[in-house]
Each structure stands twice: as C-alpha cells, then as structure tokens.
Amino acid sequence: MGGLIDLNVMETEEDETQTQTPSSASGSVSPTSSSSASVSVVSSNSAGGGVCLELWHACAGPLISLPKRGSLVLYFPQGHLEQAPDFSAAIYGLPPHVFCRILDVKLHAETTTDEVYAQVSLLPESEDIERKVREGIIDVDGGEEDYEVLKRSNTPHMFCKTLTASDTSTHGGFSVPRRAAEDCFPPLDYSQPRPSQELLARDLHGLEWRFRHIYRGQPRRHLLTTGWSAFVNKKKLVSGDAVLFLRGDDGKLRLGVRRASQIEGTAALSAQYNQNMNHNNFSEVAHAISTHSVFSISYNPKASWSNFIIPAPKFLKVVDYPFCIGMRFKARVESEDASERRSPGIISGISDLDPIRWPGSKWRCLLVRWDDIVANGHQQRVSPWEIEPSGSISNSGSFVTTGPKRSRIGFSSGKPDIPVSEGIRATDFEESLRFQRVLQGQEIFPGFINTCSDGGAGARRGRFKGTEFGDSYGFHKVLQGQETVPAYSITDHRQQHGLSQRNIWCGPFQNFSTRILPPSVSSSPSSVLLTNSNSPNGRLEDHHGGSGRCRLFGFPLTDETTAVASATAVPCVEGNSMKGASAVQSNHHHSQGRDIYAMRDMLLDIAL
C-alpha cells in the first residue's frame, strides 16, 4: 500500500523510497453512483486516495470517452483484433459489428509506466436490434452526449507540458508557463522577495508528491525545484514525455504522466494489458457473442488511433451517410499540449479494409489524405464516425499536393516543333499556348522594330497589332506585368533593301511590317527597345532615353549588341554580294535561336 512520500527526504534517501512501490488503482461501476458519472472510485491506499476519473481521462487524452453503464454501444471485433498479438491468425467468423449493452467499467493504471486502460463488460443484444433501432421501435435513450462518463463542462483547470532536456536534467527544475501556474497552482505571495510555496499533488495510484514552487530568475518565471528530480527519476521520464497537472473542483492538485510513445499513438501494450487480452481471448469472445452471454475486454485508448467501442447514436448517424471521393472533412485530433483541434483532409477512396474476412465492414473503410501530412501521425484510413464532412466536393486538382516552390511547368524540355524560315523558331508562341499562369518577373518581351517608311504612326500600328494578337492567342489568366509577347520573324521586303524574302506567315501575320529584334535584347515592357524611324542612322534607342542595352537588376542581359549591329549593317548589293549577305544573316539567325533558350533559362533562374 502506498503511503505519503516526502520527496525532500527522497533526494537524500532514494534507496528507502524505492521500497515504497505504488500500487495499481482501479475503479469499478457502482450501482449507487450518481447519474452524472457511472464510474466511481474505490480507495486503494491508506492515504485515502484513489483513481481520479478526471485524471484518468486527462492521461488518456481528449479524444477518449468512457461509456456509461447501461448505454447502447457498438463493439467492432475487427478493431479489437488489430491490437491482439495473434491478429494475423485470428479468424473467428464474427460479424463486422455487434450491438451491446455496457454492464461494467473498471479503470486501471499500469504500475511502472502509468499507462491507463479500462476493463469493460458487455452484453450482446439480439440480432434484430439494429433493425428495431432503425425503424424506431427501440429508442436509443440519451444520445451521443450521454455516452461519456465525464462531462466536457466539468473539465478541471489543467495544463500539459512536453518535457525538454532542461526539465529532465538532474541539476535543473521544471519550468511552468506563467498562465498555467496561475490557473492550476495556489496563488503565491508576490510581496515576498522570493515568492515560494510547497505543492502537494496526487498521481493515478494515489501517491502524494511534494514539490517546491518558486518564482525567481531573470526574467522571473515559475519553477518546480525541490522534489522534481526525484519524481523524474522515479517515473523514468525522458525528454519528449509529457507531465500534466490539474486542479479539480475540490481544489486538490493531481499529477499525471503521458509517455512520448502514447502521445504519438504508437504505445506498446503493457505486459498487464497483454495478459488481460490473452485471458479474454477471442475464441471466448466469439462464443459469448454467439450465445448472447457477457464478455469482458481490455480497452486501451492509446493502442490505436481508432476506438472499437463507440456509442450507437454516433454509428447510426453516419452509417447511411453518402460519403464520396473528393469530399472534404475535418477530424478531431490531439495536439502536443493535450488539447483538441480539428484537422482537415479529403476522402481519396472508399473500400473495405479486409474484404475477405470482414466484407461490408465500416471499420476504417475510408481512405483519406490529410492537408497536414505530418500532424500527429495521421492514419491513411479512418472510420466514418471519426470525421465530420465539411464543405463541398473538391475537384481533381485538390488531390495534387502543391510544393513550396513553383515548378517549371509550361516550358518544354526540348526545342519546339514550329519551323520558321532562316532557322528561327517561334519558341514563345508554342510556350505561351500552354503557359496559363505567368508570375511577375518571368515575362519575356522581345521588342518590335518597325522599318516602315510611313513614320511613327506606322510603328505604333504595328506594335498595337502585335499586342492584340498575343492577347487573343490564349492568355486566359495573365495579370499586369506577366505577359509573354513572342518575337515575330517577319521582314518587310522593300525594294530599297535589295532582299527578296518570301513571307512565311499567313492570315493576320501578313499585316505586320516589322523586323525582328535580336532575341538577346528582351526584358520587361519598361525596357523594350524601339527603332526610331526618324533617326538618320536608324539606330536602336532605349524607350526611356537610356542606352541601347537591356538590363535586369542592374546586370546586362546581352553582350551581342556589337555583333547584332554588324550583322544587320550588311550592305545590300546585286549579285554575289546579295548571297553573301543572306549567308551572314542566316548564321546570325541561327545564333539568335540558340540565344533564345540561354536567355530564357537565365531569366527563369533569376526569377526563381
């Protein structure tokens, strides 16, 4: 029997306290218990303590609920078998679910690990109970709210903290958040130079633990010092485990432990729990169900993410719900601080978990995809009663998880297949057809150079027509500053040039009277270079009166201005000179085609 433990003495006489082994406390259903809670506590030690239902529930987690005596529940053998050591070989021919009445509930806590579990006694109902409930012949009294023994409104003042390396060190103490200390602990006298007090807390086994609570440091903080190291050593706590304090309505302080494996939902079953499961083997459970006799099971709330004992109203509410692929939902999940939150996701499939042994079972029949992939080790399969449908059905695009960076979609890895005369390829035309979204700073704007002799008006007409063509050719969702204007390889074959090229474009392209700007000179619209038709030399001048070089973030995008000028200044003469000029122009166009891809990659690298 566990007695009063003074941890101030334990620090120096730890060997003596080792002999005071805490006893396992259990609770049982009492017929004389109040209607608000059908689980009462039986005193288990001389100190007058026992299992606190609030503390047991806090250690189990916010998602766990205990059934009241006499409530109608559904027992899922398939879910229970998942926790059995012989799950792979267990074939007993049980139905997917069984309607049962709760006869008894006993609370247990593992002695060495403080792991909580319950022993539940159930009585199978008749086989036609489901039909009678659906037809309204039998009224499911109460409802889902009456299923829980512990009312949510009676939740005491509680805080849960995950231990850090400093909290578990032998030379440090336990740092308590200020708001938590003021809510759960008795108030300190802050008029003293070093406010302090002694705390007395009782654990699941009824053992009392004493800590020194002090408010000190710079900046000041709440600390548990004397007695804390002995508690850590006794409970074998490590970094990642969680400790919770709660203050009930009676003002008493209680203390619980939650292991890191329990928080992650991967708790290994304790030896005592496994022994109880082996004692109540599934062959006896199957026999009890077939004969409608009482059977008992051990219920570990942390052994699985899904509960295999649920209230009947909760099951009947969702059993006929039209779930479908693409439907969005929210599910209750547990946070690290033992609080409850909603985690969203989407249904990606509907199928039986084990169609051979459990055909038509609702147990974890929904395949889901969570929006928060790494949250609390979410399962890829859930049961219908574990989620709440929210919103409308998502489209197919919702199944694609977007990464943090934009991938280079819309740009082909190879060269386009649209041929252009003189070796030039209209790369921007093909890419703009697929490029549905262009981000700011990623646009490509080759300039239009008009060589018509009808002055500036003709240049403006040619420039406006080019813009209208680009807009009508498929930019469905392009915002301002995100346009992609292709470079048109259209040359005006005037007699004074001495060159006779055939026009390869048809339709609206034949209305252009422009000459291509070297693709290396491309930038945003504010940096487009235009040809001043009134200039005597026909030189390229910056649109803003600057130099003829295009810069991005202060760096020149091309160094081929000299080469371009020399290539375009080839004299147009008769005979062999004309052939030589055509050869030079052809070579220059080939180099321009290569520069298009180099410049595009450079712009993408800068923008990304």
Curated annotation (Swiss-Prot):
Induction / repression: Negatively regulated by AHL21/GIK.
Region (Disordered): 1-40
Record's keyword terms, sorted: Auxin signaling pathway, Developmental protein, DNA-binding, Nucleus, Transcription, Transcription regulation
Pfam families reported for this sequence: ARF_AD (PF06507), B3 (PF02362)
Role description: Auxin response factors (ARFs) are transcriptional factors that bind specifically to the DNA sequence 5'-TGTCTC-3' found in the auxin-responsive promoter elements (AuxREs). Could act as transcriptional activator or repressor. Formation of heterodimers with Aux/IAA proteins may alter their ability to modulate early auxin response genes expression. Involved in the establishment or elaboration of tissue patterning during gynoecial development.
PANTHER family registered for this protein in UniProt: AUXIN RESPONSE FACTOR 3 (PTHR31384:SF5), AUXIN RESPONSE FACTOR 4-RELATED (PTHR31384)
Subunit structure, interactors included: Homo and heterodimers.
Name used for this protein in its record: Auxin response factor 3
Protein's organism: Arabidopsis thaliana (Mouse-ear cress)
